[in-house]
Amino acid sequence: MLSSPRTERVLQLAGPTVVVAVGVLMLGWSWMKWPVPLVDFGQQLYVPWQLAQGKRLYVDLSYFHGPLAQYVNALVFRFIGTSLWAIVNVNVVVLAALVVMLYRLLGQVGSTLGAMAAGVVFMVMFAFAQFAVIGNYNYMTPYEHSATWGMLTSVASLFFLGRFFEEGGISRLAASGTCLGLCFLTKAEIFLAAESRRRRSLADRPPR
């Protein structure tokens, strides 16, 4: 039976291993096939490069989303070096953190098997994929870093909120609010979705 304790223990060990293995395979299979620098992703290199040179967002550079992702990438360029590899390395970390939190969240609301299946689907369909001629829609070289950072911070807000419901602790609630505040500095539509879900969760919070 899938619900037996022994099977659950096996899945708890195998689940993360399978997701990581699929991620590594997809990374190798898609290696350096991600960006199209002449379209949207070119802006994602140009804006932080100019910020690292002293330009000011919204004053010297036109930009339509929040400042978080671009200033993070500008710091990366300033302290690590201006290169595509610097951004890709940061995006690998963003992707890894996002997958870990998604796996934990889905395991809490569903099952370990469901979390593993969702993690595999995410790695195959979204993390590295290219379904259009323009290779902008992946997490390695996204069309807009505010989208990937928005996903990370919104999921982090819900992750810490879930930990607060399970274990209590004002620090977890504060972490959830901080991540939501950071999400506000990414993309408006992602923030609105995260805030709506957070409000509903707090309204439905069971008494402790």
Regions found by a protein language model. Name each.
Residues P67, Y71, G81-V100, G119, ...:
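Loop-to-helix entry region of an early transmembrane alpha helix in multi-pass inner-membrane enzymes
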Residues N89-A118, M123-F128, A156-F160:
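Transmembrane-helix motifs of polytopic, lipid-linked glycan transferases
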Residues L2-P5, A193-R208:
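Perimembrane helix-loop-helix junctions
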Residues R172-A188, A194-R199:
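Membrane-interface alpha helices of multi-pass inner-membrane proteins
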Residues L84, L98, V120-T153, F160, ...:
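Aromatic- and kink-enriched transmembrane "portal" helix at the membrane-lumen/periplasm boundary
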Residues M32-V47, L57-V72, T82-W85:
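Extracytoplasmic catalytic/substrate-binding loops of multi-pass membrane glycan-assembly enzymes
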Residues W149-A175, L202-P207:
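Membrane-interface transmembrane helices that cradle and orient dolichyl/undecaprenyl
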Residues M1-G28:
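Start-transfer (signal-anchor) and selected internal transmembrane alpha helices
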